Amino acid sequence: MNLITTIITITITLSAVLATISFWLPQISPDAEKLSPYECGFDPLGSARLPFSLRFFLIAILFLLFDLEIALLLPLPWGDQLSTPTLTLIWSTAVLALLTLGLIYEWTQGGLEWAE
């Protein structure tokens, strides 16, 4: 048997065993918490029209922006390999300065205050 067939067989077998165990284990000692679906901390059986915290939304957007910043700056060390590393440094500094100015503006406007 060649290597790819062996790996595929092991993968399918392991997946089937783990899926069977995951369906079998909660039924050994059923509990209301085990049988209920989990949706990000929200009650799935409650009203869908509950108010959503705008502060939480703004903090989540800020997190996404700075997460994107990290993703944009990760290839920066490879930018030194280019023919013009100075241009790479200028652009990365501009991105960092723009995001820092945005963070300072958000901070001064009180957008990062969780409770007033």
From Swiss-Prot:
Membrane spanning stretches: 3-23, 56-76, 87-107
InterPro entries, A to Z: NADH_UbQ/plastoQ_OxRdtase_su3, NDAH_ubi_oxred_su3_sf
Catalytic activity: a ubiquinone + NADH + 5 H(+)(in) = a ubiquinol + NAD(+) + 4 H(+)(out)
Pfam families in alphabetical order: Oxidored_q4
Enzyme class: translocase
EC number: 7.1.1.2
Main location class: mitochondrion
Highest taxon of source: Eukaryota
Keyword Secreted: no
GO cellular component terms attached to this protein's record: mitochondrial membrane; NADH dehydrogenase complex
Gene3D superfamilies for the chain: NADH:ubiquinone/plastoquinone oxidoreductase, chain 3 (1.20.58.1610)
Intracellular or extracellular location(s): Mitochondrion membrane
Alphabetical UniProt keywords: Electron transport, Membrane, Mitochondrion, NAD, Respiratory chain, Translocase, Transmembrane, Transmembrane helix, Transport, Ubiquinone
Keyword Heme recorded: no
Membrane topology: Multi-pass membrane protein
Residues annotated as signal peptide: none
GO MF annotations in UniProt: NADH dehydrogenase (ubiquinone) activity
Similarity section: Belongs to the complex I subunit 3 family.
Role according to the record: Core subunit of the mitochondrial membrane respiratory chain NADH dehydrogenase (Complex I) that is believed to belong to the minimal assembly required for catalysis. Complex I functions in the transfer of electrons from NADH to the respiratory chain. The immediate electron acceptor for the enzyme is believed to be ubiquinone.
Official protein name in the record: NADH-ubiquinone oxidoreductase chain 3
Organism listed in the record: Oncorhynchus keta
Gene encoding the protein: MT-ND3
